[in-house]
Amino acid sequence: MSGRDNRGAGGGGGGGGGGGHQPLSSAMGKLKEKLTRVGDELGYHRVESNLSTSNTATSLDTILPEDPFLFPQVSPQRHPQSTVRTQRLLEDEPPLSFRPLLEDDDINEPPTQQLTTQQQRTPLRASGSLELTPLPPPPTSLEIREHRDRQQRSAQVAAEELQRSKQSLKGSRVSFERRDTGNSNSNKQAESSDEDSFEERRTGFQQQKATSVDHKGILKDLKHILANDNRRQFQAKKHVSLDVKGTRFLQDLLKESSSEEEFHKTRREFQGRKHQSLDPRVTFKLDKVLQGSSTDSDEEGDDAEHKRLIHRPKDITKPVIIDLKDLESESDEDFHTSRQHFQQQRSISTDSRKSRRLYEMDEMGNKRGENIRHAVPFVRQITEDGKPKLEVYRPTTNPIFIWTQVLAALSVSLGSLVVGFVSAYTSPALVSMVDRNITSFEVTPQAASWVGGIMPLAGLAGGIAGGPFIEYLGRRNTILATAVPFIVSSLLIACAVNVAMVLAGRFLAGFCVGIASLSLPVYLGETVQPEVRGTLGLLPTAFGNIGILLCFVAGTYMDWSMLAFLGAALPVPFLVLMFLIPETPRWFVSRGREERARKALSWLRGKEADVEPELKGLMRSQADADRQGTQNTMLELLKRSNFKPLSISLGLMFFQQLSGINAVIFYTVSIFKDAGSTIDGNVCTIIVGVVNFLATFIATLLIDRAGRKILLYVSNIAMIITLFVLGGFFYCKAHGPDVSHLGWLPLSCFVIYILGFSLGFGPIPWLMMGEILPAKIRGSAASVATAFNWTCTFVVTKTFQDMIDVMGAHGAFWLFGAICFIGLFFVILYVPETQGKTLEDIERKMMGRVRRMSSVANIKPLSFNM
């Protein structure tokens, strides 16, 4: 300022004075203009009066800068050496101050920054006598730029806030164009975080478009979701991946999108790979994008195809539980690979009945083959305490018919072959045993009755003991422990010198049969994958029928002693193969041996298979069983949730044995003799055995396709018809016309009867015993069911001859037929279908821990650890 301080003083007296007052007039004009603008004309007149009465030639240019209104805007502060108070000017107009010329109350102090000691200037003395204190120095160019930048940023922030308010109302471009951007009520709703307001604004379009979210709106909602763990409510409104990692990936995509077009492009790409929608129409549109047909020209045809896929009854599939955390993968590529073939290419419906079958897709997203038969949709299921229970049982991509599972099934099935041989032994052996020309000791009819009836009684004892054995020794070790006693029992019979040794051998064999019949289905149920559990689970029954057939054929050529020696040789290969297979992974988990369980699963599923998801499911299931278990397991059987599956298993065992099957098997030769058939009795038994064997293999092909209940229906109807026809034949033979020319009829009825029994009621009760019984009571409940089965077997075989004596053969067959008729209604009303379901799914359904999705739509989800 020193260069401009005394522009009027540089000349001589009058000239200099005149030159100095011209800038004063200019400055006074500026002052008047500014003070008048703020409504303070009185202050101006006071300044003018003071100047006119003063005797000074000092120019105001020595005091004022050219533009004193560029001072930065700061909050006003009191000068430490001044008591002058100022009047605030407009926010965008910096004030002006004349400290020596104005009165204290005229105007307020200017909003300048407080001066430091160094910044304070000494009073200036001009040519006059009045001392003037100068104003602070003018702002630098840097301060001016900062001031203007702050103003620009404030304006930009205000514009962005207005833009966000507009964008929050825009769900799509169409809906945004139809709305009034100046609607203040809509702006208030956009700022609201209330769920009802959110639903009201978004429900009209949110689930109807494949890319139906605005750039900023979904980002805001994603932040809300990640902060509050409120994923379920968000999932019902917006199209976001079910896994946390996918949601974070979407958030990154949104942040990186620099324009709306780029946002829609990345959004479509993301949805095409990870989209999970509760609205099937949305996902179907995404399917079109994946398949390269994103145009709407064929929309009507697409809608018709979609309805056919969604609502066709044959496309009903089974529910499965999904663990959201387990769906996370190490990389986006892994995620894409593991999910694209079974998760992204079809609709997710809140009602499992409307979920369509999965399609096997190629890399381009096109349908490559037939429907994947065993694929399952992902449906949330709820536990009995009302909280979501999330477990993982994804459709496996591991090979199913691998040799290790087949080897395990064949190994235990050889034990079933021994069981079948031992069970059928009395039918051909008693014929030669009662012959004194062959046997060195006398076998009375009463003793012969006990030879046939003691084995079921011993099976009852073995069934009771088998429950604790499989729990404490393990499934495999229990089965293995029966091999040597089978050999010993057959040797006792083969070397018998009296009836007592025969009875002892039969009792020991029956005890082992009771244990084996309990442990074999449990072992297979816990080792074989659900997709083939029905097929491989029937192998023990098929091999049991082979044992029966082998006994009948060998009995035609051997006496009872040689037949027993053959029975002693059969357990040897069974004993060798049992050493090659592992214990069940489920039993290892129940004993806390996680590493052993992992090795067993790797052996059963293959070394290249991913067994971790299945192992986690087993561990969670065992943890639930441990939390709910009690010390007294037998008391657990009486609980309502456990008694239901147990009663179904007992009912199946009851109707299996009361169909009369064991009476027919044990007394086949005698029945054909009484019927007066022209066919040799031994030949008839061989024919019955062959039919029994073939029918079981037919059942193995049908059980995983037709289901358990369908085969039970067919089995019941076939047995009802043949038993009533047999009863009519024997009634006519005893009381009616001559039926000797119908000697073929008993054999035909027996063949159809055995065929029907072997299709359903023969193998399925044992298979379902290992499926429907809960894990925590499986050992004790299977023990009770097995003991009950052998009790019924003992009653039927021991009383069959007495029934014939009392009511005749026709009465006995009619009684069995009536029981089968009742059993048909039992199957219809109470027996569940277990085809293709995991043991955990079956257990939840049997124990009543599954609810419909519609009944739990408002249940708060589990928290996510992120």
Curated annotation (Swiss-Prot):
Keyword hit for Repressor: no
User: Which purpose does this protein serve, as stated in its record?
Assistant: Low-capacity facilitative transporter for trehalose. Does not transport maltose, sucrose or lactose. Mediates the bidirectional transfer of trehalose. Responsible for the transport of trehalose synthesized in the fat body and the incorporation of trehalose into other tissues that require a carbon source, thereby regulating trehalose levels in the hemolymph.
Q: Which organism is it from?
A: Drosophila ananassae
Please state the protein's primary subcellular location: membrane
Q: Where is the composition biased (Gly residues)?
A: 8-21
Can you cite a GO biological process for this protein? trehalose transport
Sorted alphabetically, the Gene Ontology cellular component annotations on this record are: plasma membrane
Give the span(s) annotated as Disordered. Answer: 1-34, 67-212, 282-311, 335-357
Provide the topology term for how it sits in the membrane: Multi-pass membrane protein
Protein name per Swiss-Prot or TrEMBL: Facilitated trehalose transporter Tret1
Query: Lineage from the top down?
Result: Eukaryota, Metazoa, Ecdysozoa, Arthropoda, Hexapoda
Where Phosphoserine occurs, residue numbers?
S257, S258, S259, S329, S331, S854, S855
| Membrane-traversing stretches | 400-420, 450-470, 483-503, 507-527, 534-554, 562-582, 652-672, 683-703, 710-730, 750-770, 777-797, 811-831
Q: MF terms per GO, please?
A: sugar transmembrane transporter activity; trehalose transmembrane transporter activity
Q: Which UniProt keywords apply?
A: Cell membrane, Glycoprotein, Membrane, Phosphoprotein, Sugar transport, Transmembrane, Transmembrane helix, Transport
Which intervals carry biased composition (Basic and acidic residues)? 143-152
Q: Which residues lie on this side of the membrane: Extracellular?
A: 421-449, 504-506, 555-561, 673-682, 731-749, 798-810
Instruction: Give one Pfam hit by family name.
Output: Sugar_tr
Q: Point out the gene that encodes the protein.
A: Tret1
Q: Which residues lie on this side of the membrane: Cytoplasmic?
A: 1-399, 471-482, 528-533, 583-651, 704-709, 771-776, 832-866
